[in-house]
Design a protein with these regions (language model features):
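N-terminal basic, low-complexity leaders that serve as flexible interaction/assembly modules and, when applicable
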Residues: 1-14, 25-26
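Hydrophobic faces of well-ordered beta-strands that scaffold small-molecule active sites
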Residues: 2-8, 32-34, 70-75, 109-111, ...
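Active-site beta-loop-alpha junctions enriched in small/polar residues
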Residues: 7-11, 35-39, 75-78, 114-116, ...
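Gly/Pro-rich active-site loop or hairpin
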Residues: 13-14, 21, 43, 50, ...
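Catalytic domains of carbohydrate-active enzymes, especially glycoside hydrolases
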Residues: 17-39, 100-108
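Structured loop/turn residues at beta-strand edges in well-structured enzyme cores
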Residues: 27-30, 68, 104, 188, ...
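Glycine-rich, proline-tolerant flexible connector loops at the mouths of alpha/beta enzymes
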Residues: 33-60, 119
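Active-site acidic/histidine proton-transfer and metal-coordination neighborhood
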Residues: 57, 62-66, 81-191, 201
Length: 246
């Protein structure tokens, strides 16, 4: 079964969780991409509190009552690879996020690869960044099994404008990088999420990415933008056809 869902991350904090979900339902969507990432920060966010499980159960009851199943959710992306590339295990908030995803009745949890937030003119650091990510996601696999969740790895982009013209692509912006991460982790609990907007900003061929990923593609974030238009933030999440994605 395929669902057409909508995200609500851009407006959910301007109202209650229930009203934000009802807005998505009233717009005609049959499912929801729930922003656990938004509700996990800052420090007083619902997922940080002592009653976070109760909060998640309340969200699930709302989804059931209004008839809006949560078919995917987005994990936090607050962790980055340290400057000296020493390894750090996943923060505790990721375990909460994965359990909350299960409470919501959702199996597809979207993760960004963990990024190294420095300019990388060439690919010399790629092996260390790749090994770091493989190890990090390996640590999450027991939780994915415990909560019956599929980790969906989403292609990213140079959102901090660190790269300069002529530099190598940012890791995990290309189809091949993402496939190597999936194969490196080596688990049926890991698949791919294609964000068409991120791909467009990164100058990637979206249809070719779909063909390359084949059965590894589990979720699609279909959105548009104007491509790389630095120095502004390009990830506009426009409705398809309102940007320059072909």
């Amino acid at each position: 079964m395929h669902f057409i869902s909508s995200a609500m991350a851009s407006f959910c904090l301007e109202t209650t969780v229930e009203d934000a979900m009802q807005t998505v339902r009233d717009a005609g969507f049959d499912s929801l991409d729930f922003p656990l990432s938004v509700y996990s920060r800052p420090q007083d966010a619902p997922l940080r509190g002592d009653d976070w499980r109760q909060w998640a159960r309340g969200v699930r009851r709302t989804a059931d009552r209004i008839g809006l199943p949560i078919t995917q959710a987005h994990a936090s992306w607050e962790q980055a690879i340290p400057d000296d590339l020493h390894y750090e295990s996943p923060y505790e908030i990721y375990e909460r996020t994965m359990e909350a995803c299960a409470i919501l009745g959702c199996r597809q949890l979207i993760f960004h690869p963990v990024l190294y937030l420095h300019r990388m003119p060439d690919r010399s650091l790629w092996p260390r960044i790749h090994d770091w990510n493989v190890r990090w996601f390996h640590e999450l696999l027991p939780l994915a099994e415990k909560f019956d969740i599929v980790i969906n790895l989403e292609n990213t982009f140079d959102y901090r404008h660190l790269q300069q013209p002529g530099d190598a692509p940012v890791p995990y912006t290309t189809a091949q990088d993402m496939l190597e991460l999936v194969y490196g982790i080596g688990s049926n609990r890991v698949q791919l999420c294609l964000d068409t907007g991120h791909a467009h900003i990164s100058g990637q061929d979206v249809p070719e990415m779909i063909r390359a990923w084949r059965g590894n593609l589990a979720t699609l974030h279909l959105n548009d933008n104007y491509g790389l238009i630095r120095p502004v933030f390009e990830d506009l999440h426009l409705f398809p056809g309102y940007g320059t994605l072909e």
